[in-house]
């Protein structure tokens, strides 16, 4: 199975991302419901600008994060670790992402929080259901995938 396909299928079944940013040596993490865009390989989230993590991100920042399930046994562990960039969307980009986000999470229609894009440059997918410690790595723009 192609690495990005396996990652995308698993991410489509999850809904909470944890992401971390840093500013002047201070780290902060946050959680949010996400929409994953398979074509752009990007997460879309809503978060208020007044939050600590948004303030630390500014309009654009380096980001790292995870998506994981809560399995009861080690043999069922699956999860994603990533690094990349987070940025606040504006204009048409924001409008299109918000429409898609609202389709997945209709309750979000009541929120006015800005839309942010988390664009991973590297994704590591651990899937113990394929064998203990099985890892797949996707790198943006490299033209290669490591399994």
Swiss-Prot record:
Q: What family does the Swiss-Prot or TrEMBL record give for this protein?
A: Belongs to the UPF0306 family.
Protein name per Swiss-Prot or TrEMBL: UPF0306 protein YhbP
Q: What organism does this protein naturally occur in?
A: Escherichia coli O157:H7
């Amino acid at each position: 199975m192609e690495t990005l396909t396996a990652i995308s299928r698993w991410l489509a079944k999850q809904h909470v991302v944890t992401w971390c940013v840093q500013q002047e040596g201070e780290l902060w993490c946050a959680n949010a419901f996400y929409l994953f865009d398979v074509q752009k390989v990007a997460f879309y989230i809503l978060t208020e600008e007044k939050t600590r993590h948004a303030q630390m991100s500014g309009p654009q920042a380096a980001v790292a994060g995870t998506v994981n399930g809560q399995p009861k046994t080690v043999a069922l562990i699956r999860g994603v670790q990533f690094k990349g960039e987070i940025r606040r969307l504006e204009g048409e980009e924001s409008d299109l992402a918000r429409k898609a986000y609202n389709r997945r999470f209709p309750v979000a229609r009541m929120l006015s929080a800005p839309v942010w894009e988390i664009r991973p440059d590297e994704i590591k997918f651990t899937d113990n259901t394929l064998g203990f410690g099985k890892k797949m790595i996707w790198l943006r723009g490299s033209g290669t995938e490591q399994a």
